[in-house]
Amino acid sequence: MTKSNADLSAHTPMMQQYWKLKREHPDQLMFYRMGDFYELFYDDAKKAAALLDITLTARGQSAGTAIPMAGIPFHSAEGYLARLVKLGESVVICEQIGDPATSKGPVERQVVRIITPGTVSDEALLDERRDNLLAAVVGDEKLFGLSVLDIASGRFSVQELKGWETLLAELERLSPAELLIPDDWPQGLPLEKRRGVRRRAPWDFDRDSAFKSLCQQFSTQDLKGFGCENLTLAIGAAGCLLAYAKETQRTALPHLRSLRHERLDDTVILDGASRRNLELDVNLAGGRENTLQSVMDRCQTAMGSRLLTRWLNRPLRNREILEARQDSITCLLEHYRFEQLQPQLKDIGDLERILARIGLRNARPRDLARLRDALAALPQLQAGMQDLVAPHLLGLAKSIGTYPELADLLARAIIDNPPAVIRDGGVLKTGYDAELDELQSLSENAGQYLMDLETREKARTGLANLKVGYNRVHGYFIELPSKQAESAPADYIRRQTLKGAERFITPELKEFEDKALSAKSRALAREKLLYDELLEMLIGHLAPLQESAAALAELDVLSNLAERALNLDLNRPRFVEQPCLRIEQGRHPVVEQVLETPFVANDLALDDATRMLVITGPNMGGKSTYMRQTALIVLLAQIGSFVPAAACELSLVDRIFTRIGSSDDLAGGRSTFMVEMSETANILHNASDRSLVLMDEVGRGTSTFDGLSLAWAAAEQLARLRAFTLFATHYFELTVLPESEPVVANVHLSATEHNERIVFLHHVLPGPASQSYGLAVAQLAGVPGEVIQRARDHLSRLETTSLPHEAPRMAPGQPAPPMQSDLFASLPHPVLEELGRINPDDVTPRQALELLYSLKSRI
């Protein structure tokens, strides 16, 4: 805030009004309505000019200094708001609520809405296929309460999480646009690296206040019905969210009707690294192309796409729910029923967000037109669902229902193609309201009335030169030439004298004038009133309509998964109780879509006897693809989808871990190796015998000894944890693990050389790889020929003089004997080299003693 507001009395009346409002919102940009523009002043103007690339100018003076100013037309504000919200800014909308014609001094203004990244609901400001979440967290290092609100749909949830690691992983999954934290938390916390973190007063998270406000919001006496009455921290976070939402929206929130208690134990847990490595809905470059979501999403509605993304990011461990989804997909595939439903679903639109905007009372005419069309489409959709026999689909059909009365009302009320906003009218149909029709008729038919009046008056008076007209100053009038003015009837009242003419008005014309001049403004006011009444009536039906929207979104996702199963050759997986993961002819669902050649499918078999596969083979041979496809097949199975495999049998997993790829964390001061070890530590601490673990090239980034030792010990630990593990490595020494760990087996990706060039076969075969083909891969990558040849010479010498590939067998816990890396076995020690150069006959006793001490220090 600048010092310009220090003494309000020094400012002009208009700027005094501005500063009184601005003081309430010092950290937010204020859009201050002035006529047809939103103006920004002082620091806000400078900031907005830089962010939006708009002109910074100055407006007169106030308090003795020029006022920095920038403005945008109010009718194009949405585009600018979208850019600011995307940049993480919050904007205060300050509107004129007084009538300029009757105001003495500045027109009265007030803040009508605050737009923040986590509370936007306007269609133009949202990504239609992504959730836009507001989150709040409170607690200490041991236990956190987290609440999440999607104000654009009405979903509201709470959960409690143990430890920073779990909290940060959950925030990575949710990716909230805005995160509220207590102001008394220490500065520089890891989560503050996120965009959109806002600090709130500690008392905003008070549990007792939150409990009261939540009960009031849901019209309940307690929170037992939501299963969260004992979640003290989470309730505090939810109370903070509710207060913040009300503060920004400046209206009631009737579309927030319940609170969902989410439990980590119900889901497959993926940490942030695993989520990124698997590229579920964001690729490693930060885009959306070539992700699992991009391949699996052919949903007909935006709300269906958002639900599918939530499923992909939150796989389930509830076998009953998963098999109900599988049964639904099977049913939709029979007789290609999904093909009939999908075009009908397309007519539904984004019902979820339309209903939220109705609840927030900022729904636009086209929202109501889309709701009208959606409700009109429901009877035909229900007819298409009559043949569906899957119990879950029958339940969805019941929840969807039909709304003939609402559909009829909206069909009578809203014109076919309404304008974008209600401001200028023209939204409601003729015949919907008699008073509105009369006012609109007066406004629209004034010209015809005046022509008819002129004809009648000429006939009544016999004055052929009589004219009926209008001007803005004197309104409607009857004009007669001065010579005929004396012949005017008695009911003509003189209104104006002109050179050569007199103007009159009659009681009939005066009555019409009173109606006509106010008809347009009265028609607009009447239409706005009727529109608001229509919104209030729809708000009374929000609960069943929101239930219908949720069921329609799920039907869309299931129909989409049926379509994907047919067109991508996906098959139904089978869940079993006995721990196992068996995949026949599995494929990577994303890679096979971008390959120009057929994808090479592979089998995988893990069970109680074989818990780990050590995977060897050349770079580019397909090890990472094989590992990732396994994780994606499991993940798809545990959202209830069919999977890219000829057959799949699996037990439910509790976590999916991945240690794949290399990346540093420069901002966090962590090297590539440190990041790798942190991810490895997380896996070793948290994996269970129900987890799926993917480990790729553990130990690279440090010395050969250190890397091999760490990889070996990590593999042994995972074998003892009995987690289902795919362990890819270039350390061939690890291929002896099956001899000491019975639950470990070797497999390799096949390749061959032809004319000194490598050919990747991509088949997974039993046993370890025979060689790494590193030089062939380097040649394929374009390494210069002379470098390749020199490398062959070095390799030949090393292979001739190195120790054979074998490693001692150790029981768990047994200390490791000294081991020498075969890679450096042929290189003599520098001390030995120096000793070889010394002639003992040329050294004095003193020199020999000094040399001995020197050599000893170098060992």
Swiss-Prot record:
Task: State if DNA repair is listed as a keyword.
Answer: yes
Question: Which family would the database say this protein is a member of?
Answer: Belongs to the DNA mismatch repair MutS family.
Q: Which GO terms describe its biological process?
A: mismatch repair
Keyword DNA damage on this protein?
yes
Organism of derivation: Stutzerimonas stutzeri (strain A1501)
Q: Which residues bind ATP?
A: G617, P618, N619, M620, G621, G622, K623, S624
What is the official name of this protein in its record? DNA mismatch repair protein MutS
Q: What role does this protein play?
A: This protein is involved in the repair of mismatches in DNA. It is possible that it carries out the mismatch recognition step. This protein has a weak ATPase activity.
Which residue ranges run through the membrane? none
Q: Which PROSITE patterns match?
A: DNA_MISMATCH_REPAIR_2 (PS00486)
